[in-house]
Amino acid sequence: MLRSVLLATALFAQTVPATFTTIAKGDVSGQQTARQVTVRTAAEWAALWNDHAPTEKAPAVDFSKNMVVGVFLGSKPSAGHEVEILAVRPMGADLVVEYTQKQPARGTMAAQILTEPFHLVSVPAHAGPVRFQLAGSL
């Protein structure tokens, strides 16, 4: 009985979403190429932020307790594109970041301007691998 309870507890603990806080989200970034990022140190954060928004001061992150994960969609030809991190959860030794991408609906009007959608979040520090999964592909 105890073994069953411990197994159930371990399985539940691996699927409980981690808390996360949005640091920045928008459609203007210096990141022209689509990429997913995992940032574990202040030096990595300063470098990423300098590429992302060189004229703005990087938001403070306590890397002794947290890390940053994010998704950049790269350059898009119109408004209406969006990326959103939906959940961050441990799965075994990995931390899985689930996100969604949106684009303008077919046949709708969208401003013809270049955009660079992104979403950056702070999560509790995790030493293991980080995997990014497009929603629905878990």
Where does each model-flagged region fall?
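Exposed, flexible binding/inhibitory loops of compact, secreted disulfide-stabilized domains
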Residues: 13-138
